[in-house]
């Protein structure tokens, strides 16, 4: 029998992580078994091309895979995700050990393709075409209970074509899943032990409004999912500020299980740069959304994405972004230096900034964000919250076991419990005792449930 061991390396966003989790379960249902890096016959690399750095890491990883598996003559590699969609069959000539290249829509057929490749060692395949409809996958939940916190894709692709972004080219145009299919998957996960669901999409606000949708709005979907029996917490990522509907804002005040944390990407605080980016909102519009969210849910916590050093960004533009961070008071922001992405409008813009200027501005912005994050965490001290426990902490407690999980605001919380406690996937009432740099320490304040 042929060796059917596999190992998956994942780069990029939560959608990629979710894709890799599904692929692993699908392969195990087909008789494959996971193995450590360098020991598996099949290594799958799920790639990201949103920025240049993850893309370069992929090429470096492929070189390390070749070294690690050099003594296994039948070892081979499958490359999937956004870089695979972008480079395509070019991987075959550059990296001879690559035998499958699958794009973002091709993921659904990857398990069948890998079955063939294991049995036919001279075969190479590519799955790079975009499908007309959402590329629905086989329902694969694996054996036993699922994690307490799970992710559900509700759409694929994006129609926004922001000037800097390669996603519409690598994940295709927007395609919404059928509402009934989404609800069926959510019910199945809840039946298997899930208690928190995060809905995933490139632009969740426009769910259902493309030609592939069934007319259900995102706000309506939120209400349908929130009403499912057994769902204790609901989250979603990622909305686009230009599309966020009043009904979605209102949901934060009317749905008790919709968590009071929202990732609302700003990208830049300068109206001039926002226009160059093609974001189709200005700071006044963005701040009105923030005010409306806080009116609907006063304790809501916000996070953001920020691009530093977009072509033509002046010091004045950058200081407007710094001011926006302070005005909104983000609990966290994911900030990066701008990098050209092939085929995007921004690649052709003049007035590119030097690497030194971009790095200097990024350091200033992250220093400010660290201060804002510490302030937000400090504000949690003394508050009682429910923590969904995900597993043991890396560092054991002084007495007993140390567990960690997330509160409704998305904060990482560590709490000491009696040794031998079996509380994975359960909620625990705690009182926050101390704020650390990026997490909280808490004390048990009730029985787990």
Swiss-Prot record:
Organism: Nitratidesulfovibrio vulgaris (strain DP4) (Desulfovibrio vulgaris)
Name under which the protein is recorded: tRNA-2-methylthio-N(6)-dimethylallyladenosine synthase
Localization annotation: Cytoplasm
Boundaries of every MTTase N-terminal domain copy: 4-119
Residues engaged in binding [4Fe-4S] cluster 1: 13, 48, 82
EC class of the enzyme, as a word: transferase
Subunit structure and binding partners: Monomer.
Family classification: Belongs to the methylthiotransferase family. MiaB subfamily.
Gene3D superfamilies xref list: Methylthiotransferase, N-terminal domain, tm_1862 like domain
HAMAP family documented for this protein: tRNA_metthiotr_MiaB
GO molecular function annotations of the record: 4 iron, 4 sulfur cluster binding; metal ion binding; N6-isopentenyladenosine methylthiotransferase activity
Binding-site residues, [4Fe-4S] cluster 2: 158, 162, 165
Keywords in alphabetical order: 4Fe-4S, Cytoplasm, Iron, Iron-sulfur, Metal-binding, S-adenosyl-L-methionine, Transferase, tRNA processing
Record function comment: Catalyzes the methylthiolation of N6-(dimethylallyl)adenosine (i(6)A), leading to the formation of 2-methylthio-N6-(dimethylallyl)adenosine (ms(2)i(6)A) at position 37 in tRNAs that read codons beginning with uridine.
Main location: cytoplasm
Domain Radical SAM core: 144-375
Disulfide bonds: none
GO cellular component: cytosol
Cofactors required: [4Fe-4S] cluster
EC number: 2.8.4.3
Residues annotated as domain TRAM: 378-446
Catalytic activities: N(6)-dimethylallyladenosine(37) in tRNA + (sulfur carrier)-SH + AH2 + 2 S-adenosyl-L-methionine = 2-methylsulfanyl-N(6)-dimethylallyladenosine(37) in tRNA + (sulfur carrier)-H + 5'-deoxyadenosine + L-methionine + A + S-adenosyl-L-homocysteine + 2 H(+)
Textual note on the cofactor: Binds 2 [4Fe-4S] clusters. One cluster is coordinated with 3 cysteines and an exchangeable S-adenosyl-L-methionine.
